[in-house]
Amino acid sequence: MQYTLSILVENQAGVLSKISGLFSRRGFNIDSLAVGVTQDPSVSRITIVANGDEYIVEQLEKQLNKLIPVIKVKRLNEGEFI
């Protein structure tokens, strides 16, 4: 199943590397990746689209929330994004 995760992070060097490394260590392939600043220039939004089963996605969400530069992780449902 395809999942879309929206991740708010502190806008600092190395954050994308930490997040992509987490996916890599779990053997999870990223199908699509977009990064942009938010209204607050100190915060960036990373949007990741990936395929996997429910259990793996839940584990990724938990692990992402443990990373220091991560502010918030949200799984997007159809219709919640453009």
List the predicted regions and their residue ranges:
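A conserved regulatory-domain signal marking ACT and ACT-like small-molecule sensing domains
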Residues: 1-82
